[in-house]
């Protein structure tokens, strides 16, 4: 698509979908002026979560929009209402037609999305993944919130601590196809086999990234496994869902609850002693870093083979051999520290 046609299309988009960066060029254009000949091209970056209604990704979007305020870019934001790999592919196809400069996407299905992303690359569009990766040949860089090994081992070690290294536990995940969560589960199970012979993983249930379904699945698990000592929830809606199930069953404290989630969604359960630990990273920083990497790639500041990238307020971060930029180590939120955080 020609740039002039693309810009006319963007002008017609709803304001909720197009978030312009604040800069003099934009002001001139809004006043009826035009970009001066020879001025740098303004990048359009398309940003897609796994699902728009998930509080985790709402906070990712918040961080992305913070980066927009620092960068001379336009941001397109869209994604499925619920986790839907087919819808992600459809949105990518639309962005290919629009001719965006960079696509940044959290992949629901690692292999299922790779074809659409490869097509984007063939059309000259740069691709960055974040939170959950695709196949390496379908993107340039992956913005990783933490290593899969670090997350999986951290969850398993915390569950073992809470259960005094013995007893049955169950996992609630988002879907059985989520590539990042499958990676975490692999390391959870490896750590279990390596270090905790008196603990047993009895079941793994998907909740489709829905709190209500997570609550129902946790209720079912409590009924099916009367000796259950811990529910480990590895997607953000599942943590409060599992906590509510344990609370309503009158098993707070007897059945431990931990998982990956937002402190804001779990504060009450932590302070009541229903949930013992919430593990996460600073989610807004993940969205912020993703936009910084996408901008660096689209502008040419970041190239294949680079070992570091400048990431605004986060400073310079390392890039590993798998072309992954690591945000940092996970953090454990407890009733003692949860009030220090507002996301």
Language-model features and meaning:
Residues 44-71, 76-92, 100, 106-110, ...:
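Extracytoplasmic "Venus flytrap"
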Residues 22-26:
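Bacterial signal peptide processing site
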